[in-house]
From Swiss-Prot:
<protein>
    <recommendedName>
        <fullName>UPF0210 protein SPH_0352</fullName>
    </recommendedName>
</protein>
<comment type="subunit">
    <text>Homodimer.</text>
</comment>
<comment type="similarity">
    <text>Belongs to the UPF0210 family.</text>
</comment>
<dbReference type="InterPro" id="IPR007841">
    <property type="entry name" value="UPF0210"/>
</dbReference>
<dbReference type="Pfam" id="PF05167">
    <property type="entry name" value="DUF711"/>
</dbReference>
C-alpha cells in the first residue's frame, strides 16, 4: 500500500465523515420459545445478554485499533410474533420490555425484531404483535419494530396495510419517538443491519455479525474532482469509491466476528446519511449537476449512484446483503431537508425516487391530522413499487404537527419538515381489505 492510499483513508475519516454506521449482531430466539410468556421473556433476556455481552466492548476496541468511528452497536432478533405465538398472551409488551432490558444491559443503541411477517395473511401471533406495537414502542426506549406486508412472491396483504395505517396513528398518539422506530416493509430482507427495520431471519445462523457502512461525504468529495466530465467517468468514480468504503466494512465485520466467536454475515452496501453537513446523499446527487435535489434528473442521478455503489461494493466483499443502496431519509439528510424547505422536493418525487433507492418513504413527517386510510394508501403505493420491481421498499412516516412545522428528533434521526399530503380520500380503496395478488413475473417455478 502506498502513502497516497494511506492519506486517502485518513482524509475519508477525518474530513469526509466516513464511518462504520453499525455493527449489528443477529440472534435467533427460536430456542427461547415457551408456552409461558414470562418464561419466554426471561429466556430472551438471558440469551441476548449472553451472546451479545461483549458486542459493545469489541466494537469500541476495533474502532480504537483502526481509527475508524463505529457509530452504532445494535442487535436484531427473530421476529417476536413467532416467539409469542406459542403463548396464550393477548399482547406481547412483556416481550418488548425483555428486549429493552437486555439492550440496556449490554449497552447497544437499538434492538430490532419486534416484528411480524404477514405478506400473505395473519397467523395467531401476527395480529397480537401488530396490536401490541403502539404500547411496546411507548413503554420501551431501544426497541424497534417492523412489519412485512407484501412480497413479490405473495402480493400485498391489504388487510394488514389498513391495520398498519391505524397502528402508525396510534403509535404517534402514544409517544413522540415511537413512529421513528416503526417500519412497514414490502420484500423485507432477513439480514438487514440497519434500524428500524432489522430482524434476524429464520434462515440465518444462530448468531451472526452484519455490518452497515456510511460514506456519502466520501463519494461527494470524489465527484468534486471530476466536475464537468461524462457520466462514464462519474460512474467509474462512484464505483471505485464504493469499493474502498465496502472493503473497510468487510475488515471490521471479519474482525468483529472473529473476536466475538460468531459467524460473519454480510456487509450492507448502503450509503447512509446523517444530519451533519458533508454527510448527505442529496448533496452527492447535486454534485452530479442538479441545482437542487428533487428537480428533473434526480431519479436518474439516484439510479446511477445506487447501481455503481452496488458494483463497487460487490467487488470489495464476497458476502453482501441487507438493503444495499442509497438511503434517502428526509430527516436524517441535511440536503433533503433543505430541498423540502425550498419547495423542490415533495412526496410525489420522493415516491418516484423510491423505485430506485434501497428503502422508501423514510423518516418523512406529515400532518398529524392525516387520516389512517391515507397513511395506509401511502404504504400500499410503496409496497406496489417494491412488489412489481422485485425490490425492498418501506414506509417510516411521522404524523406530527401541521404542514410547514419542523419536527425535532435529535441525534442521528435529525429534523423533519412536515410535508404536504394529497387531501383526496382513499377510504373506499383501503376499506376493501383482502389481498392484491402477486405479479405475473413472480411466477418463476
Amino acid at each position: 500500500m502506498d502513502i497516497r492510499q494511506v492519506t486517502e483513508t485518513i482524509a475519508m475519516i477525518e474530513e469526509q465523515n466516513f464511518d462504520i454506521r453499525t455493527i449489528t449482531m443477529g440472534i435467533s430466539l427460536l430456542d427461547c420459545i415457551d408456552p409461558n410468556i414470562n418464561r419466554a421473556a426471561e429466556k430472551i433476556y438471558q440469551k441476548i445478554t449472553t451472546k451479545a455481552a461483549n458486542l459493545v466492548a469489541v466494537g469500541d476496541e476495533i474502532a480504537a485499533e483502526l481509527g475508524i468511528p463505529i457509530v452504532n452497536k445494535r442487535v436484531s432478533v427473530t421476529p417476536i410474533s413467532l416467539i409469542g405465538a406459542a403463548t396464550d398472551a393477548t399482547d406481547y409488551v412483556v416481550l418488548a420490555k425483555a428486549l429493552d432490558k437486555a439492550a440496556k444491559e449490554i449497552g447497544v443503541d437499538f434492538i430490532g425484531g419486534f416484528s411480524a411477517l404477514v405478506q400473505k395473511g395473519y397467523q395467531k401471533g401476527d395480529e397480537i404483535l401488530i396490536n401490541s406495537i403502539p404500547r411496546a414502542l411507548a413503554e420501551t426506549d431501544k426497541v424497534c419494530s417492523s412489519v412485512n406486508i407484501g412480497s413479490t412472491k405473495s402480493g400485498i396483504n391489504m388487510t394488514a396495510v389498513a391495520d398498519m395505517g391505524r397502528i402508525i396513528k396510534e403509535t404517534a398518539n402514544l409517544s413522540d419517538m415511537g413512529v421513528a422506530k416503526l417500519v412497514v416493509f414490502a420484500n423485507a430482507v432477513e439480514d438487514n443491519p440497519f434500524m428500524a427495520g432489522a430482524f434476524h431471519g429464520v434462515g440465518e445462523a444462530d448468531v451472526i455479525i452484519n455490518v452497515g457502512v456510511s460514506g456519502p461525504g466520501v463519494v461527494k468529495r470524489a465527484l468534486e474532482k471530476v466536475r464537468g466530465q461524462s457520466f462514464d467517468v462519474v460512474a467509474e468514480t462512484v464505483k471505485k469509491t464504493a469499493f474502498k468504503i465496502t472493503r473497510i466494512g468487510q475488515l471490521v465485520g471479519q474482525m468483529a466476528s472473529e473476536r466475538l466467536g460468531v459467524e460473519f454475515g454480510i456487509v450492507d452496501l448502503s450509503l447512509a446519511p446523517t444530519p451533519a453537513v458533508g454527510d448527505s446523499v442529496a448533496r452527492v446527487l447535486e454534485e452530479m449537476g442538479l441545482e437542487t435535489v428533487g428537480t428533473h434528473g434526480t431519479t436518474a442521478a439516484l439510479a446511477l449512484l445506487n447501481d455503481q455503489v452496488k458494483k463497487g461494493g460487490v467487488m470489495a466483499c464476497n458476502q453482501v446483503g441487507g438493503l444495499s443502496g442509497a438511503f434517502i431519509p428526509v430527516s436524517e439528510d441535511e440536503g433533503m431537508i433543505a430541498a423540502v424547505q425550498n419547495g423542490s422536493l415533495n412526496l410525489e418525487k420522493l415516491e418516484a425516487m423510491t423505485a430506485i433507492c434501497s428503502v422508501g418513504l423514510d423518516m418523512i413527517a406529515i400532518p398529524e391530522d392525516t387520516p389512517a386510510e391515507t397513511i395506509a394508501a401511502m404504504i400500499a403505493d410503496e409496497a406496489a413499487i417494491g412488489v412489481i420491481n422485485m425490490k425492498t421498499t418501506a414506509v417510516r412516516i411521522i404524523p406530527k404537527g401541521k404542514e410547514g412545522d419542523m419536527i425535532e428528533f435529535g441525534g442521528l434521526l435529525g429534523t423533519a419538515p412536515v410535508m404536504r399530503v394529497n387531501g383526496a380520500s382513499s377510504v373506499d380503496f383501503i376499506s376493501r381489505g383482502g389481498q392484491i395478488p402477486a405479479p405475473i413475473h413472480s411466477f418463476k417455478n
